[in-house]
């Protein structure tokens, strides 16, 4: 009754205050990694920037900022450009920028014999696989059990609905050059994917390229088309051809440094990120490779969860490299602290373990503090 007797503006003011408080509590209930996953639904990349003094200390003293690409600092932008964590040091001060990207899609246009192993192997190496074909007998979940999506539709319409992003990897393996041209034509109207490859003989590929160039297709984009698709390994069977295709995709993702577009080259296991977001209350430590030199078993960005009861999820390389940090990780659980651990695989200890990697890693070990304040925006 008292509320109804108040001026209308007063009711609105109280309602707005309540909404603001609700939103603050909603963010507080979402841990850092939940916030990252949520933001990645609407942005192509994020940089988690940490700064701290000393190789070990309290998490409360660590500055943490989560920024979108355009808002990132110089070191954050460098991490996004390189596609993996970047570590800067000045005396005892550390600055670490860790990039995060949505899980990349592998879009397979065509559901024929080659598409089967490409979809399977693509899912196994961490892609979210989408298969498109205009024939129901070739585009159904039973045929592609490891695909996240199987779409039976006209190629042009399906491509339009998929809204191709710069983080996508696309294989054109249709049954004829007319469909190849339709796919290329539609893809050329939107954002350029990280990888675009097309199967076919040199003659078939040449016909399609010439046709589209005469229509006004961008010659520079056409020059980046991987066709004939795959690395030259002499593959004959569908499985061998699929291996050559995935090898080329991995090469573009990991090694194509001349391509200045932002790409995810981090060694992060996306399943680890999801687990961190989904189980905020269980005691654990988070282990992240922040710098890697030489032939270390895992690259920068590799992340592992260590539980108090001995369970682990993810890996930073196994063997002596992993054993060196497991004890440190368990000792930090519940402490509210962090520590940088240096792992040297060039010495006698590594040789005794049969490790011939010869690399060096800097690993950030953090207690997963459930009461830690959210990152600054």
What are these regions (language model features)?
Residues 169-177, 185-211:
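ADP-ribose/adenylate-binding Rossmann-like module
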Residues 6-7, 22:
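Cationic, low-complexity basic patches in intrinsically disordered or flexible, solvent-exposed regions
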Residues 1, 14-134, 141-144, 168, ...:
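Segments forming oxygen-rich coordination pockets for charged ligands
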Residues 136-138, 203:
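Helix N-cap at the beta1-alpha1 junction of Rossmann-like dinucleotide-binding domains, i.e.
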Residues 115-118, 178-183, 204-207, 298:
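Short glycine/serine/threonine-rich phosphate/pyrophosphate-binding segments
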Residues 199-271:
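Adenosine-phosphate binding glycine-rich loop
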Residues 148-154:
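Conserved SAM-binding strand-loop segment of SAM-dependent methyltransferases
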Residues 156-165:
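Short amphipathic alpha-helix with an adjacent loop that forms part of the alpha/beta core around
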